[in-house]
């Protein structure tokens, strides 16, 4: 039996946060966990939409030596659950993780599993779960030469340049099709968003007349895999190739630091046109207790 430990006190950045982040970094290049990169976890924990009051539903699994070997988690919204992440494919561990989900979710239980995680998928099938929705993880090989051209009047921020946090907020807000002016965060959310200023979050911006028009964030901290999130262009500058420019520039900067590939969780044609191909698929497995 593995011990189960709930995420404590519904606090974003407690001691367990560091443990989970380190764990996800260790398994980042493991194919069956690639859909929940540590960058996705960091983005989630700093996000203003995070369901903070449900954080204690996330659980850590430890072996008899107290070593962290797995986690069952949701992503940002509690409705986007559950992800089973593990460093070992022991059937006893995976069975215990599945049991946690079925006991926690009365009625309908859902688990997101990478189809490369063959042992977990087989256990889900044997437990009466049905495979339903599919999502893709796309990848691009960074041994390629990724070049681009910016339209006249635009330029990119230099790697070591200071970022205008208000412009950064505006490009994300308008890039996700919100109108008007975003509210300044306060309290806990403001503190959480400060976490996004870490160096492992590589940020590129396409700029015109001092205003940020497009942005790509890439998460990288060693290993083979860099993670792309988010990618946005403000509505008035779409269709100009800015998205391609900021993505290629961001992943080229990760390549300079040692990344061999970059991944994104998406099925969008935009990424296919950038030369990305399917790395794996993630299915939602559903079981009803009714």
Predicted segments with their positions:
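A mid-sequence, solvent-exposed acidic-amphipathic segment
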Residues: 171-221
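Hydrophobic beta-strand residues of extracellular immunoglobulin-like
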Residues: 57-60, 202-205, 248
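Conserved active-site tyrosine of GNAT-family acetyltransferases
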Residues: 120-124, 271-272, 276
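Short amphipathic alpha-helix that is part of the acyltransferase structural core
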Residues: 1-42, 149-184
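Conserved donor-binding loop and adjoining core beta-sheet/short helix segment
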Residues: 2, 7-11, 28-102, 208, ...
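Acyl-donor-binding surface of acyltransferase catalytic domains
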Residues: 75-79, 86-154, 281-290
């Amino acid at each position: 039996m593995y011990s189960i430990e709930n995420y404590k006190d519904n606090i974003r950045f407690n001691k367990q946060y560091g443990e989970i982040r380190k764990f996800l970094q260790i398994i980042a290049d493991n194919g069956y966990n690639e859909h929940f990169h540590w960058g996705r976890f960091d983005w989630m924990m700093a996000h203003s939409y995070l369901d903070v009051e449900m954080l204690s539903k996330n659980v850590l699994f430890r072996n008899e030596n107290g070593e962290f070997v797995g986690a069952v988690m949701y992503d940002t919204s509690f409705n986007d659950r559950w992800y089973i992440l593990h460093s070992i494919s022991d059937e006893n561990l995976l069975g215990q993780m599945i049991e946690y989900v079925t006991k926690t979710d009365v009625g309908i239980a859902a688990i997101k599993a990478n189809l490369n995680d063959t042992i977990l998928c087989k256990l889900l099938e044997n437990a009466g779960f049905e495979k339903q929705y599919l999502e893709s993880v796309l990848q691009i090989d960074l041994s390629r030469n990724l070049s681009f051209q910016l339209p006249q009047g635009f330029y990119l921020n230099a790697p070591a340049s200071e970022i205008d946090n208000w412009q950064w907020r505006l490009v994300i807000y308008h890039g996700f099709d919100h109108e008007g002016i975003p509210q300044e965060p306060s309290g806990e959310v403001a503190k959480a968003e400060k976490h996004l200023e870490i160096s492992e979050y590589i940020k590129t911006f396409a700029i015109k007349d001092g205003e940020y028009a497009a942005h790509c964030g890439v998460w990288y901290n060693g290993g083979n895999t860099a993670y792309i999130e988010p990618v946005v262009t403000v509505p008035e500058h779409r269709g100009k190739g800015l998205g391609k420019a900021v993505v290629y520039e961001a992943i080229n900067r990760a390549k300079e630091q040692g990344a061999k590939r970059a991944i994104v969780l998406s099925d969008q044609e935009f990424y296919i046109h950038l030369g990305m191909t399917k790395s794996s698929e993630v299915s939602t497995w559903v079981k009803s207790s009714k």
